Amino acid sequence: MALIPLSQDLADILAPYLPTPPDSSARLPFVTLTYAQSLDARIAKQKGERTVISHEETKTMTHYLRYHHSGILIGSGTALADDPGLNCRWTPAADGADCTEQSSPRPIILDVRGRWRYRGSKIEYLHNLGKGKAPIVVTGGEPEVRELGVSYLQLGVDEGGRLNWGELFERLYSEHHLESVMVEGGAEVLNQLLLRPDIVDSLVITIGSKFLGSLGVAVSPAEEVNLEHVNWWHGTSDSVLCGRLA
């Protein structure tokens, strides 16, 4: 399905929150957290279930953001549940006109336990068509299987299986030359990074006009989080919040 045109007033709201060129002292990429949630802060009806929350207007926005980032990061749970393509279908010429590998961000899959496979995925399918890039897979040690076409980035994890976020983004910047990364999920990843104003530069959150219920997967960090430089956009049925971690 073709994307609908991006609203100009939405593009204007997003402009101050888009990646900026790094200066010579930069060690980290520009990091944007972006996701869609329901009115009760759920991003899925239940764990492992793909759930549509946002309107077509904000779907176009997602691809617009992908166009402006060099990497796109998700956890393995999201990769397994949704089998996303993680490519970009928006271009300045015309929405969806020239979906290419060059215009798409580099997929980054956090797969500490080695659950996800590139072969047979939508990411592989789109890469083979020349419409998306091959992924970087982040592992907690030496991967059991090394798949052709995949770049692997090994990181140590703590006793709870959590990654060192600072080291991860430093290495994505220095070793893979990614100057900007958008993080799309899942909940565990978002909840941890919402507590890292030292890493996260921008937030773009879509709020859909629905409730998903108490069984849904919530984005709710362990501590209070305040935002600053907040702007809102209101569409047909969604609202978009743009801001920065205080």
From Swiss-Prot:
Catalysed reaction, written as an equation: 2,5-diamino-6-(1-D-ribitylamino)pyrimidin-4(3H)-one 5'-phosphate + NADP(+) = 2,5-diamino-6-(1-D-ribosylamino)pyrimidin-4(3H)-one 5'-phosphate + NADPH + H(+); 2,5-diamino-6-(1-D-ribitylamino)pyrimidin-4(3H)-one 5'-phosphate + NAD(+) = 2,5-diamino-6-(1-D-ribosylamino)pyrimidin-4(3H)-one 5'-phosphate + NADH + H(+)
UniProt-listed Enzyme Commission number(s): 1.1.1.302
Keyword vocabulary terms for this entry: NADP, Oxidoreductase, Riboflavin biosynthesis
One GO molecular-function entry: 5-amino-6-(5-phosphoribosylamino)uracil reductase activity
InterPro entries tied to this protein: DHFR-like_dom_sf, RibD_C, RibDG_C, Riboflavin_Biosynth_HTPR
Pfam hit, one: RibD_C
This protein's record includes keyword NADP: yes
Biological pathway: Cofactor biosynthesis; riboflavin biosynthesis
Highest taxon of the lineage: Eukaryota
Enzyme class: oxidoreductase
Positions contributing to NADP(+) binding: 78, 82, 163, 186-190
NAD keyword on record: no
GO BP: any one term: riboflavin biosynthetic process
Subunit structure: Homodimer.
PANTHER family, per the entry: 2,5-DIAMINO-6-RIBOSYLAMINO-4(3H)-PYRIMIDINONE 5'-PHOSPHATE REDUCTASE, DIHYDROFOLATE REDUCTASE FAMILY PROTEIN (AFU_ORTHOLOGUE AFUA_8G06820)
Function (record text): Catalyzes an early step in riboflavin biosynthesis, the NADPH-dependent reduction of the ribose side chain of 2,5-diamino-6-ribosylamino-4(3H)-pyrimidinone 5'-phosphate, yielding 2,5-diamino-6-ribitylamino-4(3H)-pyrimidinone 5'-phosphate.
Family: Belongs to the HTP reductase family.
Protein name, UniProt field: 2,5-diamino-6-ribosylamino-4(3H)-pyrimidinone 5'-phosphate reductase
